[in-house]
């Protein structure tokens, strides 16, 4: 594209805004293709509104159903697409402060894009819509 972004990067930006319901959200993306058999991996940098305790962030991820924290950099333990292959869970690691921002957070996330990106996500979205009363469950 003329602005230097790829179509995949623009799609990721637009989808993030759409999912979060924030059309004005300032977000950027860099997408690269690497030779892995399956899976998507994302490096995420977030600037939070308020100061945070890193232990609280890690604890929140640990409590979230469907998320596996894999984060022990001293022992070279962090999520890789191979870890996520054939699994529904999202793997999160490299959870750390972004030293370039006052309330910045960095993390690395991987998932099996066929299992989580398509099939499982569709089921989870449907379940959430039923829970919110947006659609009715067929009995």
Model-derived features with residue positions:
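Residues that form or immediately flank small-molecule/cofactor binding pockets and catalytic motifs
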Residues: 32, 74, 97
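C-terminal helical cap and adjacent loop that interface with cofactors, partners, or active-site loops
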Residues: 47-49, 62-67, 80-139
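Solvent-exposed beta-strand/loop surfaces of large extracellular or lumenal domains
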Residues: 20, 74-84
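Active-site-lining helix/loop region of Rossmann-like oxidoreductase modules
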Residues: 1-63
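Conserved short beta-strand edge segments in small beta-sheet-based binding/regulatory domains
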Residues: 68-73
